[in-house]
Amino acid sequence: MTTIVSVRRNGQVVIGGDGQATMGNTVMKGNVRKVRRLYNDKVIAGFAGGTADAFTLFELFERKLELHQGHLTKAAVELAKDWRTDRMLRKLEALLAVADETTSLIITGNGDVVQPENDLIAIGSGGPYAQAAARAMLENTDLSAREIAEKALNIAGDICIYTNHNVNFEEISSKE
């Protein structure tokens, strides 16, 4: 598994993820890039789950974004519909955290598209640890979205054996 966290604060949204890929109880690779920019760098996305499955979903999601001229929610709903109803796609095991300058969403294989409370997303095996840490920082500090995401991933990496400290981030600032 992994940890992906998305934090939105003061006109900035950040998605960060660790780099560990495991097979069973063995670390296969420590520098997987699980966070990407999509649709002309206007959308950022991170995945938790099977790497090959996630790359397939990134490609499909980017096609949906192009089809719907970058409308994040519409593209997410259409991907979730296909993911749930297509026999081959149904077998893909991953979660996606996606964001543009105004909206953050979680997309699942059961057809769910969820806009989380407080625009805070944390998915993967270390998600609960990262979410608790990020929520505490959002409510009690003036740290930036990037600083909160970094610290939340660091805490998750200290606790979750399927999360490492080799993290990467993508961020978007609103034009306000």
Swiss-Prot record:
Signal peptide location: none
One of the protein's GO biological processes: proteolysis involved in protein catabolic process
Regulation: Allosterically activated by HslU binding.
Main location per the UniProt record: cytoplasm
InterPro entries per record: ATP-dep_Prtase_HsIV_su (IPR022281), Ntn_hydrolases_N (IPR029055), Proteasome_sua/b (IPR001353), Proteasome_suB-type (IPR023333)
Domain of life assignment: Bacteria
SUPFAM superfamilies for this protein: N-terminal nucleophile aminohydrolases (Ntn hydrolases)
Gene Ontology molecular function terms on file: metal ion binding; threonine-type endopeptidase activity
Transmembrane spans: none
Subunit (UniProt): A double ring-shaped homohexamer of HslV is capped on each side by a ring-shaped HslU homohexamer. The assembly of the HslU/HslV complex is dependent on binding of ATP.
Name this polypeptide is given: ATP-dependent protease subunit HslV
Organism in which the protein naturally occurs: Proteus mirabilis (strain HI4320)
